Structures are given as C-alpha cells and as structure tokens.
Amino acid sequence: MDELTRDALNALPEWLRSLADDLAVLAELLKDTQLSEGLRLWVAGAVGYVFKSVDLIPDGIEDLGYLDDVFVLRLAAARVAEENSESDAPLPPSITQLAEGAALVKKLLGSDFARLDDFVSGLRIAVVRGVSPSDIVQDPALAAQVCDEVASFARSYVPPPFSHDERTLIKLKSFLSAKLP
C-alpha cells in the first residue's frame, strides 16, 4: 500500500466522523459580516451542497456516501482561506485545518481534481431549495436559518461506515470521474 492510499484510508473515516462539526464551523462564517461577501458565497455554496438532494455521490451509498460532501467542504474552506489570506479578519483554526485537507483531495483525485474544483466554484451560484448563496449572504435572517438547519443536521447525523480497503478508494475515484461535469 502506497503512502497516498494509507493517508486517504486514515483521513476519510475521520472526515466522515467530523462532517457535522465541520459543516457547523463553516456555516457560522455565514453570520460573520467581517468576512467579505465573496468569502461567504464559498461557504453558502458548500453548505447548500450538503443539503442538495442530488449529490455527485448519493449519501446512502455504502462507504462512499458523504465523501463528496467532505471533499466539497474542504475545497470551499481552502478557497476561503486562500482569499482571506490578505484580510485582517482572522479565520477560526478549524477552517484552516479543513482547508489543509484539500491537498489530500487533490493528490487522491489527480487529474479529476480540477473538475471537482470547478464544480465547487459553481456552487457559489447554485440554487438549492429555491435559495441562492447570494440570498443567504445578503439576508442575515436567512443565514441564521441556514445555521439552524445545519445544527439540526448535526444533531441527527450518524457517520456512515467506511471500509479501510483500497477498493473503496478505487470506487470513489471511479464514481467521481463518471459524475463530475
């Protein structure tokens, strides 16, 4: 087993376990008016994706469900950290940790990473349940409502099982390669 495979098989189950907490930390940024609207659009798009009924990988698929969600959160966090690097508004350390995970996603997906990154960029304008990320960012009451929905999700979220098997990574990469636009 190579180092990348070992790193991924160790990280992915932990990412699945922390999904609810990671989502909650990101969602809290929606209410932080010190952050630019552009940064909060990244967050709103990623948070909306988790609640979207049509995922790249349906959440119920054994071993793979929610992995697309944890990837999207990390890529969005990386964009937030990157674009915030010259700002005076500090980000919570947990956002930086999420952002660091994007490097593993990039290594794992190889040539398909650019397609996922483009997909995540498009989430900034994706409408979920009739609400766009800009609606959320511009309306404090709507941002608070999204945070409440995230808190409700976090209370009921049960991390799915994950097989520490190289075949799981092969299935994951194949699924994303086939589904990414």
Residue ranges, per PLM feature:
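Intrinsically disordered, low-complexity, charge-dense segments enriched in Lys/Arg
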Residues: 97-181
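Amphipathic, well-ordered alpha-helical segments in soluble domains
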Residues: 22-25
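Transmembrane alpha-helical segments and their cytosolic interface motifs
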Residues: 31-51
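Long, hydrophobic, amphipathic alpha-helical segments used as structural scaffolds
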Residues: 34, 61, 65, 84-88, ...
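Membrane-inserting effector segments that mediate pore formation, membrane fusion
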Residues: 46-73
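Polybasic, low-complexity association/targeting segments
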Residues: 1-20
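Membrane-interface alpha-helices
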Residues: 63-94
